[in-house]
């Protein structure tokens, strides 16, 4: 990566494949998510596979002395045929809906990243559901999204007003419910 100063202040990180690469693969500014970064990674057998991931820049000191960067899990761009039924639908969903961000399980210190990755994940799920409902025959639609369940397990003890962490966690829990409302709105 490379820190890019603007008028002597660092606000942007650019990601390059190599130190002397001419073009950057992705960039991100403080407080933002990057667009998809397309890359290649070795799988467990040593085979190079195309993947996509996103960056989230939490902090970048104005003088460049401190950096806190989150890299999402990588989404393989070749669908695993064992993940979907029918098998061929996985690649079709990737082709029509793009890569998916898996929800982070980074824990309480990074609860905000958990909520943000769930929001990205749920947005993809809504797009995938709409694609399937519009383009495939179906008799029954059923969907189980775990975001609120996970959020309640992680935060429920801290969303009572007596909790010293209430001010941090209550707004996050509300965002999870808003994310599910947005999914429902996209499906209507």
Write out the residue ranges for each language-model feature.
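Metal-dependent active-site segment of extracytoplasmic phospho-/sulfohydrolases and closely related
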Residues: 175-188
């Amino acid at each position: 990566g490379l820190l890019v100063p603007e008028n002597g202040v660092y606000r942007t990180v650019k990601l390059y494949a190599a130190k002397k690469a001419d073009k950057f693969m992705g960039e991100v500014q403080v407080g933002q998510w990057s667009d998809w970064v397309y890359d290649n990674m070795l799988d467990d057998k040593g085979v190079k596979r195309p993947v996509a991931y996103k960056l989230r820049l939490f902090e970048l000191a104005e003088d460049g002395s401190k950096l806190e960067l989150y890299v999402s899990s990588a989404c393989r761009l070749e669908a695993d045929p064992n993940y979907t039924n029918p098998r061929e639908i996985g690649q079709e969903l990737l082709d029509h809906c793009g890569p998916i961000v898996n929800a982070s399980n980074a824990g309480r210190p990074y609860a905000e990243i958990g909520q943000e990755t769930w929001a990205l994940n749920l947005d993809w799920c809504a797009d995938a559901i709409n694609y399937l409902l519009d383009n495939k025959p179906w008799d029954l639609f059923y969907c189980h999204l775990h975001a609120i369940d996970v959020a309640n397990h992680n935060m429920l003890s801290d969303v009572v007003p007596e909790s010293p962490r209430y001010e941090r966690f209550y707004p996050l829990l509300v965002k999870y419910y808003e994310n599910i409302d947005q999914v429902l709105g996209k499906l209507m």
